[in-house]
């Protein structure tokens, strides 16, 4: 019976850490949360090493060999509701108010919390693009142009994600579509500032979370995970820039820009 509870507790801790990483949790916080949960569940000699896309953990139960587990976390998206739910679960365990069975049920609930609807994501991109265009020197006339560019980017991202296309190619195409749209509108309505509209629309694609977490990981002494996140942010930024450049090149070739 002790072996069964030990295995379930260890799997629970690994699932919690994976949930944090999959939904935008910090590497340092994921590792700390796993250690707290393991101690609360009575998992002794627990050692864990967390990377941006992987978890390595081991534990030992007296009377049996050490157990090692590895989890691969290939993709990372942001769902702070799930992160908060796991953090709350960790606090409940530390306070001794939950057992393994109750914690498993709570974790399953946390992992299935619904994401934002596609319509809400599109609305956020539209409003965000228009707002950023105004903040970066645009006028009220530039805001609708940026809003439509943000709409195009959101549609591209959603469709490509649905078909499993990688983030780099997705951002190239999304930035290209937004750029072409803004330049085309400026060609018809010269009063429109295409630069402001493009910059505003691109802001919804920028890898702000990856950049911030990369810096935080490095400051926490986790140089490997921090470097991985910063490289990810750099690749995304480069793909966005590449999409804009392709848009301008095509527009110049057509004599529009």
Where are these regions (language model features)?
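Cytosolic regulatory modules rich in charged/polar residues
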Residues: 28, 98, 102-115, 168-169, ...
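Alpha-helical transmembrane segments and immediately membrane-proximal extracytoplasmic
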Residues: 49, 66-81, 95, 109-126, ...
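Soluble N-terminal domains of membrane-associated systems
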Residues: 1-97
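Alpha-helical membrane-inserting segments
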Residues: 131-136, 152-161, 177, 181-189, ...
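Cytoplasmic-side transmembrane-helix entry/capping segments in multi-pass membrane proteins
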Residues: 145-148, 166-177, 200, 227-232
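Internal active-site segments that recognize and position negatively charged phosphoryl groups
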Residues: 108-167
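Generic detector of multi-pass transmembrane helix bundles and their immediately adjacent loops
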Residues: 186-257
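Hydrophobic alpha-helical transmembrane segments
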Residues: 64-75, 85-93, 115-122, 141-150, ...
């Amino acid at each position: 019976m002790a072996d069964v509870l030990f295995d379930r507790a260890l799997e629970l801790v690994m699932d919690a850490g994976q949930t944090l990483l999959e939904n935008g949790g910090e590497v340092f916080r994921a590792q700390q949360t796993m250690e707290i949960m393991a101690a609360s569940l009575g998992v002794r000699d627990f050692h864990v090493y967390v990377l941006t896309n992987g978890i390595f953990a081991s534990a030992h139960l007296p009377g049996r060999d050490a157990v090692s587990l590895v989890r691969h976390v290939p993709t990372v998206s942001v769902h702070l509701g799930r992160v908060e739910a796991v953090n709350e679960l960790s606090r409940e365990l530390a306070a001794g108010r939950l057992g393994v069975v109750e914690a498993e049920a709570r974790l399953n609930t946390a992992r299935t919390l619904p994401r934002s609807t596609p319509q809400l994501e599109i609305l956020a991109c539209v409003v965000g693009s228009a707002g950023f265009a105004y903040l970066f020197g645009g006028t009220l006339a530039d805001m609708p142009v940026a809003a439509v560019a943000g709409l195009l980017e959101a549609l591209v991202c959603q469709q490509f994600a649905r078909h499993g296309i990688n983030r780099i190619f997705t951002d190239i195409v999304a930035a290209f579509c937004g750029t072409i749209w803004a330049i085309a509108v400026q060609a018809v309505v010269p009063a429109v500032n295409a630069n402001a509209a493009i910059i505003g629309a691109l802001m919804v694609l920028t890898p702000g979370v990856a950049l911030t977490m990369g810096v935080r990981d490095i400051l926490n002494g986790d140089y490997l995970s921090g470097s991985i996140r910063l490289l990810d942010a750099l690749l995304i930024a480069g793909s966005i820039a590449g999409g804009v450049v392709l848009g301008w090149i095509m527009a110049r070739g057509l004599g529009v820009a």
